[in-house]
């Protein structure tokens, strides 16, 4: 089998260069030679066949179970409680978050507490010597960071390297050289490993956590077409390779260098963005007739793609040259090799599509099983824009047909990016069936572990639920709403707006008060766009009296959010639309006193009322036989010089019996209106 795989890999020099013309453009075309079947069970041809030659089944005397097998069996019998908060937030009921902001703060506080506990344990290890865990859990015990060997020796150097003391390790190495002591090649390589991994700087206590966060920011910046975010994310990575640093100095002082020494330097340079220096170091490695390992080749492929001022053809040819050198040096590629190539091809946009398909086919031809990160890179390459074009690729359907029903295990750091990118494509294509297929894959086996951290999980479910609101029947959408929110994720205000629009299409507006109640619970009390959407839907049409009363109560609650001012939140300014909608809802529910109070807010906040609102106020005044209220409506329209003022005045004189005082007031308003119109006409004639 190894010889067959090597023979297949030898075709890389030509297989990746020939354009595909007669084969399908999808990445999942199955090749018979790339299929592998397990031969663990022999099936007899028929019942009468001779079974003497069949394989004998051997029953093992003892079955070795995993230490957590019982826990796994118990966990498989328990399903998610849709009414409970996520497991990470199950603490004191008062502390359970109710919004995405609070959940993020909760997780940060929890991580801060863990770091504080580790600091105390490691600072005072003598008080934490009792080990009560069975089996032993190393991460719960103190870590000893203080060196025990005081004299200057190679053993002391090895101890400080193990403790990740960068500066102390370099100092002892220099002292050993000054004393004329020869440091072994193995120890020197270990020191190079330390320096190249941390970029010649002391690692912080939460180095791994910071690296994970910074890598996520850089990945999100690459996926978005935003140059500012790319520069910001790249700047935050901080550590860059500096010329003539400790690693280069120690490497130059080494009397003997092996392949490990060169490979460590190359990988350190690539990690800290010294791509040109890494390629030069590889040339030096070849000149010394040494061979690089597969991990070094993976780093060199990345460095080749990131070299500035080089065109696509040049970069791709250089990558192919590296692959040919792998064949010449008898270095077999691994999954990371192909994933690195696909990730680099994403930088080439449309030029990288055909090489990506060729790379994927070659990958499967030599028997390497793709991971979720492989499909993620292909999706990101073929669907780089949010809105689908007229000739969008259908490759996402081939991918889902290939992997539906499969259970994946972690193989690549980017595996947890797949579901986010796949659901983004489903949303852009407006394909609900495909979204269900992706969600079904997520719930297959332990694939849920690849949903990613909290921001990616929220992105995935927000896209999924928004697509449900757009394409699914309202009853099914509401079932998903109860199942996912808030037990799985906390909705953004736009998610709730999508749900409101789905309720509007299905004529289920009676649920709007409940949606507003949920919005307050999820921390969207001060979201003006959400409140305006709710008010608009309630005020757009006439409804039965019971529903109008519920809408008026909801409008009064929304009105209180504009009037109140929390200690942490400045009061929102009154939008004109919200004033109009709330006043209309009060009028239709028969809450006339509250509605007439809204007229004063128009003057107070200098907002112009709509003509429909003024007409409804006139209807309300007529229904209550109140000419005084009608006069107030005319005064309000006149104060804003609205064109409808003349029509309202005519309605006032025709529909109401006015007192002498009211007639005089109305005459004054008419005179002021005519004077203002004559002044405007004279100004217009002068301009002419």
Swiss-Prot record:
Annotated PROSITE patterns: PPR (PS51375)
Entry GO MF terms: ribosomal small subunit binding; rRNA binding
Stretch forming the transit peptide: 1-37
GO biological-process terms attached to the record: mitochondrial translation; regulation of translation
Transmembrane segments: none
Gene Ontology CC terms, in alphabetical order: mitochondrial inner membrane; mitochondrion; ribonucleoprotein complex; ribosome
Keywords (A to Z) from UniProt: Acetylation, Mitochondrion, Repeat, Ribonucleoprotein, Ribosomal protein, RNA-binding, rRNA-binding, Transit peptide, Translation regulation
Cited InterPro entries: Pentatricopeptide_rpt, PTCD3, Rib_mS39_PPR, TPR-like_helical_dom_sf
UniProt-annotated location(s): Mitochondrion
Spans of repeat PPR: 149-183, 184-219, 258-292, 293-333, 334-370, 371-412, 415-449, 457-491, 492-526, 575-609
Residues that bear N6-acetyllysine: 126
Main location as per UniProt: mitochondrion
Disordered: annotated span: 667-688
Job of this protein: Mitochondrial RNA-binding protein that has a role in mitochondrial translation.
Family listed: Belongs to the mitochondrion-specific ribosomal protein mS39 family.
Quaternary context: Component of the mitochondrial ribosome small subunit (28S) which comprises a 12S rRNA and about 30 distinct proteins. Associated with the 12S mitochondrial rRNA (12S mt-rRNA).
Name of protein: Small ribosomal subunit protein mS39
